[in-house]
């Protein structure tokens, strides 16, 4: 049940809000936990059962970590249990295929359906247990509060990956931080509508271009069409995921739960390192705090620091998908970050901002070809076709892949991914102001809502890309 679906917007969300606000405060967390479980059960009963199991294990584990004098053995056990569940569903087939490539037929290839949100709430649970073991937070005593923290349907499906230390003050329905004022509710509506517009009006339309290009073997397509298709994918990926994140933040505000920002206009970055500080911020910061720093971070010698970066980004790529193209995507980013740390960043700082920005965008685009292609070999074929500027087979024209409307949406996406907001600081401030919009802003939101709902009710929406991760 995508946030941009008819079922969610017209049934699930209004019903959950109505029941939540009609109940007394002491019962509201139970209502929120129940609706969150129903949300996950809609995607599959097995997935909901896995969620309940992991929630129980990590809640009990957190309680035990808070009491034991020697916490490390239990922490390792909890992390291994969480990763075993994630690995069994997400990576077992990939591992078997890799082994079978060397010893054919040795292992059965299992491909169980990945439970909704598993990659996200497993990382949330690991972070919670690690923080309890480190003494950064106290363990949560109330299982309902823990369920709301771990699996609130606003962030459970695709993040942001939340931290208990940030969320704990909001887990009490009677607290001041949980109070929803009129301005806060209006802010939630604004973020929900903006996210819906990003998804339904821009991302889903750009997906039409990419889907057509990706459905044709890269070796047969002219280079300009390959560039068009994967440029559309790059913009689709941003508007799809940042649109989801906006909707998640808006939904959280309705219930008095503030979720962390996950994007800060990443396509405005002037280095790949800066890009990762702006893109999927909750995942990047999770890997920084729970993998990179424990490995030694940047406190080590330069050679070890680079090794740490390669490990972290190989894992980051693997988190995104169980395929070698995802590992290669992560390693490429790790290599680029190593180069920036070895001196490239200092050299770039001598260049005008425009050149640094172009350097970043071009490298991102090239690596996203690997990430977004139907497979690693196809991604390499795309890059080969572009670098050799191949003519492709006859009969493939631009008009067959994108009409004027889609090209205009693609052009608009370049402006709206951050450039307009950077040029108009007042617009950026208005978009993120936690208060009711002005009359002009309200009119704009109504137009976006109308256009977004037109797409939704027409059945032209698709699942969010990050739901598959």
Where are these regions (language model features)?
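Membrane-embedded transmembrane alpha-helical bundles that form the catalytic cores
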Residues: 1-468
């Amino acid at each position: 049940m995508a946030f941009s679906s008819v079922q969610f917007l017209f049934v699930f969300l209004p019903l959950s809000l109505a029941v939540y606000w009609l109940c007394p405060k002491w019962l509201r967390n139970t209502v929120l936990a129940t609706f969150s479980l129903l949300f996950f059960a809609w995607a599959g009963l097995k997935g909901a059962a896995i969620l309940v199991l992991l929630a129980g294990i990590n809640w009990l584990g957190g309680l035990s970590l808070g009491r034991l004098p020697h916490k490390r053995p239990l922490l390792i056990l909890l992390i291994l249990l969480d990763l075993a569940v994630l690995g069994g569903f997400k990576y077992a087939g990939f591992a078997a295929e890799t082994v079978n490539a060397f010893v054919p037929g040795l292992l059965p290839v299992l491909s169980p359906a990945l439970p909704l949100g598993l990659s996200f709430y497993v990382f949330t649970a690991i972070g919670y247990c690690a923080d309890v073991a480190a003494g950064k937070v106290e363990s949560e005593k109330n299982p309902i509060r823990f369920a709301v923290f771990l699996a609130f349907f606003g962030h459970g499906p695709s993040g942001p990956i939340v931290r208990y230390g940030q969320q704990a003050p909001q887990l009490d329905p009677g607290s001041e931080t949980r109070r929803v004022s009129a301005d806060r509710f209006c802010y939630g509506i604004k973020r929900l509508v903006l996210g819906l517009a990003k998804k339904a009006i821009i991302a889903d339309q750009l997906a039409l271009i990419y889907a057509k290009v990706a459905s044709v073997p890269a070796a047969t397509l002219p280079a300009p069409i390959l560039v068009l298709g994967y440029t559309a994918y790059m913009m689709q990926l941003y508007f799809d995921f940042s649109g989801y994140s906006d909707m998640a933040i808006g939904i959280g505000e309705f219930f008095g739960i503030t979720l962390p920002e996950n994007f800060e206009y990443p396509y405005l970055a002037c280095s790949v390192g800066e890009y990762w500080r702006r893109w999927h911020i909750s995942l990047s910061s999770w890997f920084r705090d729970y993998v990179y720093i424990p490995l030694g971070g940047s406190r080590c010698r330069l050679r070890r620091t680079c090794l740490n970066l390669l490990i972290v980004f190989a894992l980051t790529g693997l988190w995104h998908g169980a395929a070698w193209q995802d590992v290669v995507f992560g390693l490429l980013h790790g290599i680029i970050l190593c180069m920036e740390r070895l001196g490239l960043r200092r050299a770039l700082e001598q260049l005008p901002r425009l050149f640094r920005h172009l350097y970043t965008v071009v490298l991102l685009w090239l690596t996203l070809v690997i990430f977004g292609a139907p497979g690693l070999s196809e991604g390499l074929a795309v890059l080969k076709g572009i670098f050799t500027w191949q003519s492709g087979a006859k009969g493939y024209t631009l008009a067959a892949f994108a009409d004027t409307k889609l090209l205009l949406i693609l052009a608009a996406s370049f402006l709206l991914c951050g450039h307009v907001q950077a040029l108009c600081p007042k617009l950026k401030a208005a978009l993120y102001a936690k208060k009711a919009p002005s009359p002009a802003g309200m009119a704009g939101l109504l137009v976006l809502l109308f256009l977004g709902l037109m797409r939704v009710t027409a059945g032209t929406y698709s699942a969010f890309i990050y739901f598959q991760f």
